[in-house]
Curated annotation (Swiss-Prot):
Its EC number is 2.7.7.6. Keywords: DNA-directed RNA polymerase, Nucleotidyltransferase, Transcription, Transferase. NCBIfam families: rpoZ (TIGR00690). It comes from Pelobacter propionicus (strain DSM 2379 / NBRC 103807 / OttBd1). The keyword Calcium does not apply. This is DNA-directed RNA polymerase subunit omega.
Amino acid sequence: MARVTVEDCLDKVENRFLLVMLASKRVKQLYKGARPLVDPKNNRLVVTSLREIAAGKVGYEMIKRQRTQQ
């Protein structure tokens, strides 16, 4: 993958807003020392996180909150 595009990532994530949230959380993990799941190739952390998402190495799980009755 020479360049990672938004379209590459949108195959794995439902919408652009969710993609931004997922990528930013992964960048924070990488910044704190998490090991990259793809070859970083001296890229910035943002590019590495997008490459991981496009490769299907990073995903998400939606959690629905249940309403509490008052």
